[in-house]
Amino acid sequence: MQLDAVQVSGQHLSIRQAIGAKREAAVVSDGVAADDIGSIPDFGLGEALQRVPGVSMVVNNGRGEAQFMSLRGFNPDYNTVLIDGVALPSTETSRRVQSLDVIPASLAQQVDIYKTFNADMDSNAIGGIASLRTRSAFDHDGPFASVRANVADWENRRHLQGSTPSGQVQGTFSDTFGPDNRFGVVLSADYFRRDSSSLNTAIDSYSYYANGVRQNLTPGLDTDGMAIAPDRFRPLSYDNLRQRRSVFGKLEYDDGQVMKLALSAGWFEHSNDEQRRSQWINRVGNAQLADADDGRYAQGSAQTDANRFDQTRTLRYAQLGGSFRLNQDGHVDVLLNRANGSYRQDTREDVFTAAASTRLGFGYALGEDTRPTITLVDPGYYANPANYLQSYFLTRVENSSTDTTTFNVDYSQNADADAQGWGLRAGLHYRDLQQRYNLDETRLNPAGRVSLATVGTDDARICPYADFSCLLLVDPARVAAFAAASPGAYVLATTNARNSAISDFRIDERSGAAYVMGTWHGERTQATLGLRNEYLQRQVRSAVPQPLSSTTNYVQQSDDSDRRFLLPSANLGWDITPALKLRLAGSRTVGLPTYGDIGQNSSPVVDTTGLTINRSIANPQLRPRRSDNLDLSLEWYPDQDSQLSVALFHKRIDNEIVRLTSTDTERDPGGLVGTYEVTTTQAINTGAATVQGVEFTAIDTRFDFLPGAWSHLGAMANLTLLDPRTAQVQMSDGSLRALPGLMESPKRSANASLLYDIGPFSARLSANYTGLQLLSAATDNRVNDRYYDAITSYDAQLAWRFNKQLRLTMQGRNVSNARLTRVIGADQQLMREQLDNGRAYYLGVDYAF
């Protein structure tokens, strides 16, 4: 059935464009495109990408925003995000990955997810590449403008301050001008605001009992059949005001024959003002068991604390690019990009504790798939501020900054997508990166007894549970006022200088690559064969105390490394029929270690009496992961609005990186005198891991086989299944066990959307499923492995188009109120944390003219 431009609009146009891009791509890919209003119907880039086959998202600390991209089940550190062909710097403290909640979806005209690789692509991508193409003035004939405005209501409102409106405003303008409309300009701006709260119900840890006796967890201990008791119950309430601001501009020139030029710049900022309040009750001694799931503690201790985290992530860049045609089929492309990614967090922490007491005893009863029920012996004692003494208060400032300079020169001869016959691509790529991290901490300890009753509590009330006490709230303003009025009541902690210096590091990297790639475009076949030669020079500088027990004296250590990689790649496409396409691909890619793993140390714990040292140190000599990738994809396109595909992939990853803890005996370590037992936690390269998987995708935007109004239904669905064979982790007793999975990598993930379009009305109901994800692997016993439990969330969108320009939208986010849950236990049956972010509802207007 032929559909004209009037009939195809909105979400149908977006899906058609994405299908077309996948069909014409030289590699295995998927994607998402803007619709005719110039909008991807999501608020952040991460939310848009999680609808793409094989993509799942790591949520921002579990609190409701899609932040990092997991592709084909590979955690974010295995993947790369490009904007107009350039890998921009991270806005995190110790990871290389980009925070996608910083980038608005409105920036993108098209996002392609490349799952196989060519020699001209960034090689730091074992899982894949998300390539974002920004808007161009030449996407439209003449002037184009769009405005999008939404007002939102979050179900979970802030407790400590009055809630303010949530929503989004974005605008885009583009036009061509000058002689023959050879010049173009694009301007866009976006503001997003989320005013909400979250509740985290935390248990933290459990103890295991055999015959009424608490067991020390060791790697060989079999906990099957043992009684289980929670050690701590800790509600945490978060008040968050998140804001995203962005500005983007592009000036273009295209003479239509010889030369294209583009000068673009972007500034993106994401801020989070977070107020956290928590109170916990903790066991003292062992549980008195009633049966396997309930009992009581005769004594307990307690703590109440207040934290404020003022976080700002900023990404800014400027880019100049040009394409110069040498002949009818050949051109040279040149690109220069300067970028900076930064992260700053200002922390204020106030802590008050209640000493062990029988009046803080409590009973417990484990629930199935729910939090344990906690029954306090004396709720009045638990809630009395006179029983809590100040432990300390501190301020901490973290600053991380990454500067990059990228320069690319690429030559292409008869190798563009519309070419026929043999072609050639070759190029040189260079990148300079400078990463800096600095922490400054000031902690003050009370010189005497300071109770919370003396300081005063917060007047707000937070009562998360009907069957448990309201939180006893610390008021940071009253603590600060008390400290200012009583400066002699506090002394500086002796650890301030050490904690401020030991975590600092700086990394300088210079990488370059030269590649050559042959191409073939036949009537029914397409192929690429290439080789990329890449080098990486790195210098890492960090501080260590000298001697290791010192809190005031430090020495700088420096480490240099130089590595080279030969990275072959090949892709073959065969149009078996006009509607059926087969793809084969093989490649080698790398995965660079995180900044924290190669540069960041932590303060050592030195016991000069017991002659022991516990430390966590960086490993600047970590080698990058190396992956050999094989892919097979079969794609069927019955028409331009439907698709059915299956893709198989296999990856062998050498030099896998895991964090291991080892204990050795050292004589006179780090300037100390004597023979010490030294326990060291460090990221190291270990054995190989293999991952194989399969992806299924089915799209049909119109069920033409159904009668009447039912024919306007459509659907999209994709499923990714992963089968990893992981490297081994060293346990606390020196034994080895296979990791139960790849970190932050679900073995199963799926998306499904039900579509309906009839006349001016359109609707979309979307479901996103993410399977069990390993978050950390324990070295004492596997029961302490931490996971995100499987979760399914639902979103709904309704739209009414009044005319070609105006559209009214209604959206529901997380309409089933799915709660992210972190679990532990032999069968992941124990709730460790559950995060309630609530539902959100948006009412908006889109207007294009």
Residue ranges and their predicted role:
Residues 52-53, 89-90, 102-148, 198, ...:
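A beta-strand signature from Gram-negative outer-membrane beta-barrel systems
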Residues 46-87, 115:
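Extracytoplasmic beta-strand/coil segments of soluble accessory domains associated
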Residues 7-43, 68, 76, 86, ...:
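N-terminal periplasmic "start-of-domain" segments of outer-membrane beta-barrel proteins
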Residues 300-317, 499, 503-512, 561, ...:
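Outer-membrane beta-barrel signature, preferentially recognizing the C-terminal barrel domain
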Residues 650-652, 657, 662-664, 669-778, ...:
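Gram-negative outer-membrane beta-barrel transporters
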Residues 713, 768-778, 799-849:
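C-terminal beta-signal and adjacent terminal beta-strands/loops
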Residues 162-283, 303, 311-321, 327, ...:
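Transmembrane beta-barrel wall of Gram-negative outer-membrane proteins
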Residues 121, 137-143, 178-183, 257-258, ...:
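Short loop/turn motifs that connect adjacent beta-strands in outer-membrane beta-barrel proteins
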